[in-house]
């Protein structure tokens, strides 16, 4: 039996190259469709694939053709209605149908095409969703790069210490070597054994020939047995190499207001923002830690599940969350070794006497050590004292940004605005 092994890079997806070319060519239309679709999704369905529709006019291929109007002369074969030198009257109006965009009035004539709809995968969706986004002011910590390494497996080697020997790989090599070295002898042995069996059953007996065959069979078996079961050539050892640890370590603090003034719709919008942030971090960076803090009158560090699904609520004192963040930074995240980020979401409702304290904590303790601090206020009401205090911070600190979200449709544009990749001149 003949076996064919398909080693093409695309495997079963033989149109992958064409698909990638299509995505690159119509990236602007696809991203526009994705930005519209994300606002219609539920909080738990943000990271799945998406059906994308593109207007037919946007994907039509360019072609040369006669324009409408003008004066043209053509010669047609005659028939029972027209003879030589007859002229055909020009049709009245432009005629023709168009694409079904849903605009205009009904007509009994004309035809067109619906928008082109296709499905993109989860990976393609997330790549387009977070394209051109990055953590601002991300810097490398050079001393960690020079001093700390981590051991990783790196295949196999023919030399090493006995403790690292790979028994399975060594036995595989031994079997392959013995099979290659004895294959010819085994075929010859099988032929001699078959011949001996045939002669021993024949009449009259051929004693001398049988004796010769038995000697040759014994010699072949001895040669096969002399092939060593294991040889130093077969031995393989697990190989390890030291690689420098990634030099850009980062931690993101997520501070969410869960006080009684935050109704369910406002909390859902805050969660949607943080889910986008979590997907962006996990998709773009390999070694970013996330610290979740929920706060009302009290602040508490929680895990991911409790952050998104806990029903606990209460009054509003924002400064407690900032104090807790400061404590965690001092305890676990040295600013000299970590890039520290924070994203705070609130409806802006805070105890009036507490807002100046928030300004003081941020200005004196947090903003001097963080790379970037973003604040989003989710409300349709007028801004209150917390927003006004934060406006003073924005005017003073370049690493502080704030945005206002009124409706669900504002979440993704605000997210892109906060984490838009900076150019070289901007980062400088």
Swiss-Prot record:
Residues 78-111 are annotated as: Disordered. InterPro entries: UPF0229. Residues 92-103 have a biased composition (Gly residues). Residues 78-90 have a biased composition (Basic and acidic residues). It holds the Pfam family DUF444. It comes from the Bacteria. Belongs to the UPF0229 family. This is UPF0229 protein YeaH. The lineage of its organism: Bacteria, Pseudomonadati, Pseudomonadota, Gammaproteobacteria, Enterobacterales. The gene is yeaH.
């Amino acid at each position: 039996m003949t076996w064919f092994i398909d080693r093409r890079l695309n495997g079963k997806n033989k149109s992958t190259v064409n698909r990638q070319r299509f995505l690159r060519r119509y990236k602007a239309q696809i991203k526009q469709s994705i930005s519209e679709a994300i606002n219609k999704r539920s909080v738990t369905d943000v990271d799945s694939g998406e059906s994308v529709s593109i207007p037919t006019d946007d994907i039509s291929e360019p072609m040369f053709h006669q324009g409408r109007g003008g004066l043209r002369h053509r010669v047609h074969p005659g028939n029972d209605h027209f003879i030589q030198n007859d002229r055909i009257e020009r049709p009245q109006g432009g005629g023709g149908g168009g694409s079904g965009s849903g605009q205009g009035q009904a007509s009994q004539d004309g035809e067109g095409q619906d928008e082109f709809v296709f499905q993109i995968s989860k990976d393609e969706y997330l790549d387009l969703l977070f394209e051109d986004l990055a953590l601002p002011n991300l810097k490398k910590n050079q001393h960690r790069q020079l001093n700390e390494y981590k051991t990783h497996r790196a295949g196999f080697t023919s030399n090493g210490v006995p403790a690292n020997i790979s028994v399975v790989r060594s036995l595989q090599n031994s079997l392959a070597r013995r099979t290659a070295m004895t294959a010819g002898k085994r075929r010859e042995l099988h032929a001699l054994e078959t011949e001996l069996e045939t002669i021993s059953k024949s009449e009259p007996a051929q004693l001398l020939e049988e004796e010769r065959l038995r000697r040759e069979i014994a010699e072949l078996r001895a040669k096969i047995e002399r092939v060593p079961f294991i040889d130093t050539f077969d031995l393989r050892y697990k190989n390890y190499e030291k690689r420098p640890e990634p030099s850009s370590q980062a931690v993101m603090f997520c501070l969410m207001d869960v006080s009684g003034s935050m109704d369910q719709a406002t909390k859902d919008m805050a969660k949607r923002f943080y889910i986008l942030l979590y997907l962006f971090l996990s998709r773009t960076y390999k070694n970013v830690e996330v610290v979740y803090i929920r706060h009302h009158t009290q602040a508490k560090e929680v895990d991911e599940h409790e952050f998104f699904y806990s029903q606990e609520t209460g009054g509003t004192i924002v400064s407690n969350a900032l104090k807790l963040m400061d404590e965690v930074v001092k305890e676990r995240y040295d600013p000299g070794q970590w890039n520290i980020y924070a994203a705070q979401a609130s409806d802006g409702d805070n105890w009036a006497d507490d807002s100046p304290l928030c300004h003081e904590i941020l200005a004196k303790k947090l903003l001097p050590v963080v790379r970037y601090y973003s604040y989003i206020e989710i409300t349709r009401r007028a801004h209150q004292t917390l927003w006004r205090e934060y406006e003073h911070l924005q005017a003073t600190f370049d690493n502080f940004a704030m945005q206002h979200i009124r409706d669900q449709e504002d979440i993704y544009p605000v997210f892109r605005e906060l984490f838009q990749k900076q150019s070289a001149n901007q980062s400088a």
